[in-house]
């Protein structure tokens, strides 16, 4: 399974994760996002998405430690690598794989599950120039 997590780069960017190597991903309050965070398992792939003015997928991470149950759910992520070509939100909106995705339908959802097709679409767009 793969996931996409959103972050405001002015608060904590993918560069910060690369610098820190690992971080505890917490501060999630939306009930659906918390449910998604609880569903993450160690070893799963994670794409990091910058919100705000950037609005693009910028890097890859991996779940190191799952979040467990309870109210204060958090997972530990480690940086994997930066995408060669960041993938803008406009590219995702144009891809049919994302037509029903919570990423587009629930814009404020900060932790989003990705289907295999969506993961492949991000990887393909990250490799190919526009």
Predicted features along the sequence, with ranges:
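A generic structural signal for short beta-strands and their flanking turns/coil linkers
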Residues: 1, 21, 41-44, 57-59, ...
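Compositionally biased, charged N-terminal/linker segments
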Residues: 1-42, 126-130
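Short, acidic Gly/Pro/Ser/Thr-rich loop/turn segments
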Residues: 10-12, 84-85, 119-121
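Hydrophobic/aromatic beta-strand segments within beta-rich folds
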Residues: 43-47, 111
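Hydrophobic beta-strand signal
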Residues: 47-48, 62
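Short, charged beta-turn/beta-strand-edge "cap" motif at the junction between a beta-strand
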Residues: 49-55
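Aromatic- and Lys/Arg-enriched surface recognition patch
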Residues: 58-112, 116-117
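Charged phosphate-binding loop/patch that engages nucleotide di/tri-phosphates or the phosphate backbone
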Residues: 111-130
């Amino acid at each position: 399974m793969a996931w996409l997590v959103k972050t405001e780069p002015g608060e904590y960017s993918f560069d910060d994760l690369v610098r820190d190597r690992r971080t505890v991903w917490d501060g999630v309050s939306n009930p659906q996002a918390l449910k998604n965070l609880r569903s993450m398992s160690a070893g799963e792939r994670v794409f990091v998405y910058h919100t705000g003015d950037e609005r693009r997928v910028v890097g890859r991470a991996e779940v190191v430690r799952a979040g467990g149950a309870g109210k204060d759910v958090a997972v530990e992520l480690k940086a994997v690598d930066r995408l060669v070509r960041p993938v803008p939100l406009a590219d995702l909106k144009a891809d049919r794989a994302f037509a029903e995705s919570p990423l587009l339908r629930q814009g404020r959802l900060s932790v989003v599950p990705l289907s295999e097709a969506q993961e492949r679409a991000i990887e393909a767009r990250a490799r190919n120039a526009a």
